[in-house]
């Protein structure tokens, strides 16, 4: 098992996920910081985020999800309400641990948290598959929501 830095991991996962998606879904852009990556289509404020959470959330905790971070809390709330109405479908596809909730600054999100006790290169592929599966499930709903 080869250790990997968080900054390399958050860049590698979206790149690997892209290859697992249909042509229609693989053309996203990526913005990265040392602790997170944001994969998005037409609006950067609506993105799929993979983030290493601060230690106050637990050691080696991660989050993956669809974040609604537009400048208007009303838009973010409307998107959250739409996804909340489809949460049974989302959980059926992605797992019961996915939640939809209000977050910070008027932002909202549909997400899951998980722990990787040790971050290794071998975790890139399964995490990319998890991200690709989330995009395949959530992006059609996001596009319908507007």
Spans of features found by a protein language model:
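Short, well-structured alpha-helical interface segments that form or flank functional binding sites
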Residues: 8, 41-46, 59-63, 81, ...
